[in-house]
């Protein structure tokens, strides 16, 4: 099937500086690339906005007819007290914020929250632990019970809990875990300005272990942490050269929290998030692009542009770990006003 009028086929090709082309007609035929360069991706990020939106929408409509959006709910099972020194995070023991360490939520309480999320319309339940890494023992056994319970409710189950061993990944897969989240946060070049307690290679190794266990990969990053556009292109390059691409790519905007080293950083221009989402959609056509933290500060119009140009999931609920999120009713109205259907798996 021809995606657009062949008479304007040449305008449906994006020319890069090295004289190569990205033919948007070929994407529908399964031409998924894993050899993107940072230069190519930056050229896409820098396109005139209307041109970028048009190209992204071609890909988005091709893979997501009807603009269906998955609603995911996120619960912080273990909040605060993390030994990592992530400069953006209010849960780090290195940052003097109002977030205090809390005990791990019990299994039944987590499953109650999962039921409530399902009743509210979510079909993916994500659980977060503020840990550097998973340790074997009672807490991990409880995590396995939570995963099994969430799956028995008919929900997808996602966990984010830091680094992981091969054995732990296998046990989570046996419990039915749908996805494991482990973000790269930023580019390899900018990474040392954000965190020193874990290497970039540590993160990539965690992703490898998740993939080898047969669990789908959820991996994205954060913009607005003082990085350049080239850094954003470099982050996307790392993601888009993974083979296969991550099934889920959360795109976050920094929420500057008082007491963190990034407390004084200004909010990004909402159109920067639109550009990031649109570019991610173009280079990773089959991945689910998740509009994640920082969504509240974007405004309705920018959120709709993100949904139009590539985002096909939002985190749904009043809180994301320790930061605020649009209220459930506001999200329902947003999706209804945009004519978007939720959910799909």
UniProtKB/Swiss-Prot annotation:
Keyword Cytoplasm tagged: no
Chain residues that bind [2Fe-2S] cluster: 126, 158, 218, 290
Cofactors named for this entry: [4Fe-4S] cluster; [2Fe-2S] cluster
Domain of life assignment: Bacteria
Gene3D superfamilies xrefs: Aldolase class I
EC number: 2.8.1.6
Radical SAM core domain location: 67-295
SMART domains hit by this protein: BATS (SM00876), Elp3 (SM00729)
Cofactor remark from the record: Binds 1 [4Fe-4S] cluster. The cluster is coordinated with 3 cysteines and an exchangeable S-adenosyl-L-methionine.
Binding-site residues for [4Fe-4S] cluster, renumbered to this chain: 82, 86, 89
Pfam families reported in the protein's UniProt record: BATS (PF06968), Radical_SAM (PF04055)
Presence of keyword Metal-binding: yes
Pathway the protein acts in: Cofactor biosynthesis; biotin biosynthesis; biotin from 7,8-diaminononanoate: step 2/2
Biological processes annotated in GO: biotin biosynthetic process
Subunit-structure text: Homodimer.
Family: Belongs to the radical SAM superfamily. Biotin synthase family.
Function statement: Catalyzes the conversion of dethiobiotin (DTB) to biotin by the insertion of a sulfur atom into dethiobiotin via a radical-based mechanism.
Name by which UniProt lists this protein: Biotin synthase
The organism of origin for this protein: Prochlorococcus marinus (strain NATL2A)
């Amino acid at each position: 099937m021809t995606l657009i009028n062949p008479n304007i086929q040449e305008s449906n090709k994006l020319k890069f500086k090295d004289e190569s082309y990205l033919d948007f007609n070929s994407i529908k035929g399964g031409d998924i690339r894993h050899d993107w360069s940072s230069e190519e991706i930056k050229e896409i990020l820098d396109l005139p906005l209307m041109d970028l939106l048009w190209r992204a929408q071609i890909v988005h409509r091709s893979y997501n007819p009807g603009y269906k959006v998955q609603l995911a709910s996120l619960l912080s099972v273990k909040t605060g007290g993390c030994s990592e020194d992530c400069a953006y995070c209010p849960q780090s023991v290195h940052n003097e914020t109002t977030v205090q360490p809390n005990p791990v939520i019990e299994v039944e309480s987590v499953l109650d929250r999962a039921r409530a999320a399902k009743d509210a319309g979510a079909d993916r339940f994500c659980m977060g632990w503020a840990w550097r890494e998973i340790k074997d023992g009672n807490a991990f056994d409880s995590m396995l019970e939570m995963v099994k319970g969430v799956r028995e409710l008919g929900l997808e189950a996602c966990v984010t809990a830091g680094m992981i061993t091969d054995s732990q990944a296998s046990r989570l897969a046996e419990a039915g875990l749908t996805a494991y989240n482990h973000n790269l946060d930023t580019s390899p070049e900018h990474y040392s300005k954000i965190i020193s307690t874990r290497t970039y290679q540590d993160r990539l190794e965690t992703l490898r272990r998740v993939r080898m266990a047969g669990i789908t990969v959820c991996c994205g990053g954060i913009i607005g942490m003082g990085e350049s556009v080239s850094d954003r292109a470099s982050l996307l390059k790392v993601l888009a050269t993974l083979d296969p691409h991550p099934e889920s790519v959360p795109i976050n905007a920094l929420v500057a929290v008082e007491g963190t080293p990034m407390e004084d950083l200004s909010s990004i221009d909402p159109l920067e998030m639109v550009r990031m989402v649109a570019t991610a959609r173009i280079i990773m056509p089959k991945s689910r692009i998740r509009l994640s933290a920082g969504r509240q500060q974007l405004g309705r119009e920018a959120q709709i542009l993100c949904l139009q140009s590539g985002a096909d999931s939002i985190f749904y609920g009043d809180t994301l770990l320790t930061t605020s999120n649009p209220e459930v009713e506001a999200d329902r109205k947003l999706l209804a006003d945009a004519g978007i259907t939720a959910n799909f798996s």
